[in-house]
Amino acid sequence: MLSWALTFLVVAIIAAVLGFTAVAGTAIEIAKIIFYVAIVLFLISAVMGFLRRGSSRTL
């Protein structure tokens, strides 16, 4: 689960570079939306990873 959190963080950083520096041109708004969605998914995945690490449950 923590690997997904890092993946979402990388996606968020890439979206931020493309969206906030105006490199993407017309895709700025889409990049900003992807950035915020990826940040939310990163936070959820990080919290779930830490919670699952604390429990001894495995799937």
UniProtKB/Swiss-Prot annotation:
For the keyword Translocase, the answer is no
Show the stretches that span the lipid bilayer. 4-24, 30-50
For this chain, the annotated S-S bridges are none
Q: How does it sit in the membrane?
A: Multi-pass membrane protein
Transmembrane helix found in the keyword field: yes
Q: Where in the cell is it found?
A: Cell membrane
**What keywords does the record list, in alphabetical order?**
Cell membrane, Membrane, Transmembrane, Transmembrane helix
* Pfam families, alphabetized: DUF1328
- One annotated Gene Ontology cellular component of this protein: plasma membrane
The domain of life for this entry's organism is Bacteria
> NCBIfam families this protein is in?
PRK13682.1-1 (NF010226), PRK13682.1-3 (NF010228), PRK13682.1-4 (NF010229)
Q: Name the protein family.
A: Belongs to the UPF0391 family.
UniProt-recorded name of the protein: UPF0391 membrane protein AZC_4184
Species source reads: Azorhizobium caulinodans (strain ATCC 43989 / DSM 5975 / JCM 20966 / LMG 6465 / NBRC 14845 / NCIMB 13405 / ORS 571)
